């Protein structure tokens, strides 16, 4: 009876979780070439809003709010990222960097077409610089 139960458990094991969870940290290079100056203003305008937060992208639009994040406006995007998804000064262990840099993984963000290398670089360098707030925001860095 025990062998039958064990066989059934082993056979069902692969049916549980079909995707691995993202790692806590990955290796990233901060000596890459960003497409633009790695400020949050640029990151939001040139990558996040257009790629993840537009009505066409839907995932992190005002309506989509996937993962509880809206990139519909700069303040919401900054608040969402700095509420545990970014470790200022530590891009290797920042959830947003892990997910955007894990090309081909089930947890890659955005799903489908990844961010371009220069966009990922700008994100990595912004986090490395301490994830400073947008230029018009009060309160400075997180």
Indicate residue ranges for each PLM-predicted region.
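Sec-dependent bacterial lipoprotein signal peptides
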Residues: 1-17
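Aromatic- and Gly/Pro-enriched helix-to-coil junctions and flexible linker segments
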Residues: 17-142
């Amino acid at each position: 009876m025990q062998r039958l139960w064990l066989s059934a458990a082993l056979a069902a094991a692969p049916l549980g979780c079909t995707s691995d969870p993202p790692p806590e940290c990955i290796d990233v290079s901060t000596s890459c070439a960003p497409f633009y100056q790695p400020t949050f203003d640029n990151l939001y305008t040139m990558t996040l809003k257009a790629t993840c937060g537009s009505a066409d992208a839907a995932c992190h639009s005002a309506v989509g709010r996937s993962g509880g994040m809206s990139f519909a406006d700069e303040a919401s995007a900054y608040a969402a990222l700095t509420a545990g998804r970014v470790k200022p000064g530590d891009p290797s262990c920042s959830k947003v960097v892990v997910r955007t840099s894990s090309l081909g993984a089930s947890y890659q963000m955005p799903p489908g077409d990844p961010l371009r290398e220069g966009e990922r670089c700008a994100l990595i360098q912004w986090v490395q610089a301490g994830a400073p707030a947008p230029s018009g925001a009060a309160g400075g860095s997180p």
